[in-house]
Amino acid sequence: MKIYRVGGSVRDELLGLPVKDQDYVVVGATPEEMVRLGYRPVGKDFPVFLHPETHEQYALARTERKIARGYKGFEVYAAPGVTLQEDLARRDLTINAMARDEAGDIVDPFGGIADLQAGILRHIGPAFVEDPVRVLRVARFAARFGFQIAPETLELMKEIVHTGETEALVPERVWQEIAHGLMESHPSRMFYVLRECGALARILPEVDALFGVPQPAHAHPEIDTGIHVMMVIDHAASKQYPLEVRFAGLTHDLGKGTTSPDEWPRHIGHEARSVELVMGLCERIRVPGESRDLALLVARFHGDVHRALELRPATIADMLQATDAYRKKARFQAFLQACASDFHGRPGFADKPYPQKEHLSRALQVAVDVDAGAIAMQLNQSHAGKADLPMRINRQVYAARVERISSLLSHL
């Protein structure tokens, strides 16, 4: 029985990056032996065990054989006779197929170290095409490390897309990989790779449709809507904004992809169209509620936020109400972060001031200080009829908030 540390932890260690999760492969053991040694079985599809003390994962060496479409269509074979090299050979990329033995020596049968040094993402063998998730993973690694994709690997990615394997991806896995990619330091790289191999048009056609759609040059020097959206998510990443903000940045302009070419470069009404497309995309790939809800708000209101300095107090109060800012203050700040990223995501705009963000934050601050409870109590004591009391309370609270915002703006 021999134990090897494998995969991402070995890769990251060689790159000088922090090592998070550590995975191990056990060669020459049976499930019964592992249990006798105190390991706890947890794997459903293949033998995986948790270490009795560290609780890290230890998997028996295994091979896989494709028997059906999709990333779950594999038959797994695990036995004491499976070698380390056979186990490593089933992995996706050379940089992920290295191991470190108990003496600390590196086992690198496929040239992973050389590819790390050269900054290359290269597949191991022809079995790469059997798992469509690998298209998403390679794109994500490109965003993480900034590595180039080997030409032959890119060709196999195109083959996976062409054969329709990506259609078999379950929605939850698509979202999982997209979310991971958005959280990388340069998320745009993931989407450019997906577009280059044809996968973006299959899994996120609404985003793919943005490329080649022009915008007014005076407001968008980058012209291309797809490029703009990529700049938006990269700006959000540079500010280390959370996933919800980055996803909202990715989807805020989806409606521009449906503008008739006769109307280019203007996109009148694209906000309403964006809302509809965001909802459909979120339903299709099972986007969690927090990311979906923020994306819908940003799609609908980002134009109003950009015009915030010109808005009347009542219009600002209406926006605060419509975005549920009084109850969800943290989400409203994320909303403003996404709108600011939209502004900054243009050539030459990264360091320009965006006073709208502070303007609306201060408006919320003064409006939220209105004591709705005191207003309700006063009306309850002075108003004989109770039938329309809730409506009267809402009107008074709204009026008080508008007055507070108006007072604020008069002093700016």
UniProtKB/Swiss-Prot annotation:
Q: Binding of Mg(2+): at which residues?
A: 21, 23
Q: Which cofactor does it need?
A: Mg(2+); Ni(2+)
Give the residues the record marks as binding CTP.
8, 11, 91, 137, 140
Tell me one Pfam family matched here.
PolyA_pol
Keywords, ordered alphabetically:
ATP-binding, Hydrolase, Magnesium, Metal-binding, Multifunctional enzyme, Nickel, Nucleotide-binding, Nucleotidyltransferase, RNA repair, RNA-binding, Transferase, tRNA processing
What is the UniProt remark on how the cofactor binds and its stoichiometry?
Answer: Magnesium is required for nucleotidyltransferase activity.
MF term (GO), any: cyclic-nucleotide phosphodiesterase activity
Any single GO BP term: tRNA 3'-terminal CCA addition
InterPro entries in the record = CCA_bact, HD/PDEase_dom, HD_domain, NT_sf, PolA_pol_head_dom, PolyA_RNA-bd, tRNA_CCA-adding_enzyme
Q: Where does ATP bind?
A: 8, 11, 91, 137, 140
Q: Which reaction does it catalyse?
A: a tRNA precursor + 2 CTP + ATP = a tRNA with a 3' CCA end + 3 diphosphate; a tRNA with a 3' CCA end + 2 CTP + ATP = a tRNA with a 3' CCACCA end + 3 diphosphate
Q: Which family does it belong to?
A: Belongs to the tRNA nucleotidyltransferase/poly(A) polymerase family. Bacterial CCA-adding enzyme type 1 subfamily.
Assembly mode: Monomer. Can also form homodimers and oligomers.
Additional info?
A single active site specifically recognizes both ATP and CTP and is responsible for their addition.
Q: Cross-referenced PANTHER family, in alphabetical order?
A: MULTIFUNCTIONAL CCA PROTEIN
NCBIfam families listed in its UniProt record: PRK10885.1
What protein name applies here? Multifunctional CCA protein
- Organism of origin is Nitrosomonas europaea (strain ATCC 19718 / CIP 103999 / KCTC 2705 / NBRC 14298)
